[in-house]
Amino acid sequence: MEETQPPPQPKLPLCDSLMIWLQTFNTASPCQDVKQLTSGVAMAQVLHQIDAAWFNESWLSRIKEDVGDNWRIKASNVKKVLQGIMSYYHEFLGQQISEALIPDLNQITECSDPVELGRLLQLILGCAINCEKKQEHIQNIMTLEESVQHVVMTAIQELMSKEILSSPPNDAVGELEQQLKRALEELQEALAEKEELRQRCEELDMQVTTLQDEKNSLVSENEMMNEKLDQLDGSFDDPNTVVAKKYFHAQLQLEQLQEENFRLEAAKDDYRVHCEELEKQLIEFQHRNDELTSLAEETRALKDEIDVLRATSDKANKLESTVEIYRQKLQDLNDLRKQVKTLQETNMMYMHNTVSLEEELKKANAARTQLETYKRQVQDLHVKLSSESKRADTLAFEMKRLEEKHEALLKEKERLIEQRDTLKETNEELRCSQVQQDHLNQTDASATKSYENLAAEIMPVEYREVFIRLQHENKMLRLQQEGSENERIEELQEQLEQKHRKMNELETEQRLSKERIRELQQQIEDLQKSLQEQGSKSEGESSSKLKQKLEAHMEKLTEVHEELQKKQELIEDLQPDINQNVQKINELEAALQKKDEDMKAMEERYKMYLEKARNVIKTLDPKLNPASAEIMLLRKQLAEKERRIEILESECKVAKFRDYEEKLIVSAWYNKSLAFQKLGMESRLVSGGGACSDTGACTPARSFLAQQRHITNTRRNLSVKVPATTSD
């Protein structure tokens, strides 16, 4: 009997098998033949399904779908697909594609070469088995036909072998690669044994079917022969007849056929047992194949981990070198940190600007228009803050002036009260003398004339001239002194106020810049901590971002440090001018004190002369009537001065109320800005992932009003009190 063998399955080429594999993705564009794939649209859609994060919508939109017969557009699309695959291998997988695997794009687009197209599809297959969804893609490959599976497995093996040859040598990697090669060889052997067993089983099945057919035919022939035997029983008794001879001959054939049947039954049983053994071996080989596939997947995963670890180790070495450089740079900044720590109490104002700038930098890529509006708002608020601080400084200076004026007016009031008391005493004395004089005038009018003439004659003319001349000189000296000294003092005070304003502006700017330096140093420390924590686990992109952030913060820190040095130089330049002004004011104050002492000495002499004159007049005639016009003039002057004092007191109260209202407005504005600042800080802390800050470097910051009070107190200590000049 001839054994019929099944025809061998034709081995599909690489391009056709990979096209069958591409059809499992169910892309929008067709991928049935080579010409449909040369447009590059179907391959781009397959790459988008393989890794949508890398081959995103923006990358897919660059692939033109309306291609037609334009080979240039096809070449552009296929070139973009190849560039995307190369970047995916190099940047995401960290692998180098060997030159043997890179296809010729001109052959694909112009000639529709299936060999070059198969190389390109082989690279897409490598992307699928190395991406995050590789288990799903491997399961899809296992559902294909066996011939397609065999071609796909050989393509994967070729791709992995060429990748292994192009990768740099390493001891640990070499061992894993050897294990991977051994696993792949065992997998190939198992697949070959599986194929042989399958063919052998098919051959045995064919033999069993042929034997079964032969058995059935023999059984039917046996039945026919039995029927003929029953019909010819009567003729078989005579052995000399032809029928008997045929009967004996048929009986011999029947015995031979029975023996052959028994032999075939035994062979069938043997084949059945052998088939069962082969099925058991097939099941064992399938289990072994599954184990080898799992081992191959594990080795592939280990290879991926090795590649990732190799890339991360290289990046970690680079990061360690950069961290060492940054450590050296940070060690150079210790002196600056010490200076900044001493001035941290006055650096809270700059935090508003830094927080707003950080928020604007975070939202810059998302909303450019919002960034511009926020910048304008921050600038307006900064201008308002500076204007309000300047206004508060000016109001503090005005309040100080009003207080000095108030003190001068109080001194003038006390002096006027003393003069009023003395004038009251003299007025009472004059009233008494006037009553006596009236009584004397009623008795004798002529006596008064004689007394007046007598008093005028008795009163020496020299004393009168001395009194008048001293009064005139006293008034002229006071007017000259008040005019010149007041003008000079006002000029010096204006210069001093201008210097103080400049000093305050520079101090505020210095405070803001130092706050910015502190914030930038805090950010640098956070970045350094994050670099130290990540170490070898950090990816290339995160390390590059951290480097860029650190470089940007270092540049900002150097710029702010240069601005701070410039402002400190300006403050040092202004300091000697202030010292000179203070010396001039001290000299003028000493001169004023000398002149006040001279004036007091002249007033004492004048009072002494007046007392002597009064005593002389009293000794001459106690009933003499003094001039009542001078008393009325003094009363009018006293009333005018009291009215002026009341007006000044009312103006001082109004100024105090205005100052109080402005302070309330400033405090309300500050509370509102502080609330916005807290909200910004909370959002920044939430978005930053709770970055830890150096608690030792931070000191409790003063509020806005406390800072303004501190500035006014220091300014008040620096300012010079000018003594009020006494007026007539």
From Swiss-Prot:
Which intervals of the chain are annotated as region Disordered?
481-512
In residue numbers, the region (Sufficient for homodimerization, interaction wit HOOK2, HOOK3 and AP4M1) covers 169-444
> CDD domains from the entry?
HkD_Hook1
Subunit and partners: Self-associates. Component of the FTS/Hook/FHIP complex (FHF complex), composed of AKTIP/FTS, FHIP1B, and one or more members of the Hook family of proteins HOOK1, HOOK2, and HOOK3. Interacts directly with AKTIP/FTS, HOOK2 and HOOK3. Associates with several subunits of the homotypic vesicular sorting complex (the HOPS complex) including VPS16, VPS18, VPS39 and VPS41; these interactions may be indirect. Interacts with CCDC181. Interacts (via coiled-coil region) with RIMBP3 (via C-terminus). Interacts with LRGUK (via guanylate kinase-like domain). Interacts with microtubules.
Full protein name? Protein Hook homolog 1
**Where does the source fall among the domains of life?**
Eukaryota
Coiled-coil region? 169-434, 477-658
Q: Which family does it belong to?
A: Belongs to the hook family.
Q: Which organism is it from?
A: Homo sapiens
Q: Name one GO molecular function term.
A: actin binding
Q: Which UniProt keywords apply?
A: Acetylation, Coiled coil, Cytoplasm, Cytoskeleton, Developmental protein, Differentiation, Microtubule, Phosphoprotein, Protein transport, Spermatogenesis, Transport
Q: List localization entries.
A: Cytoplasm; Cytoplasm, Cytoskeleton
Q: Which residues carry this modification: Phosphothreonine?
A: 699
The GO biological-process annotations, alphabetized, read as: cytoplasmic microtubule organization; cytoskeleton-dependent intracellular transport; early endosome to late endosome transport; endosome organization; endosome to lysosome transport; Golgi organization; lysosome organization; manchette assembly
Spell out the InterPro entries in the cross-references.
CH_dom, CH_dom_sf, Hook_C, HOOK_N
* Positions of region (Sufficient for interaction with AKTIP and VPS18): 657-728
Which SUPFAM superfamilies does the record associate with it?
A: Hook domain
Residues annotated as carrying Phosphoserine in the record are 235, 719, 727
Compositional bias of kind Basic and acidic residues: 503-512
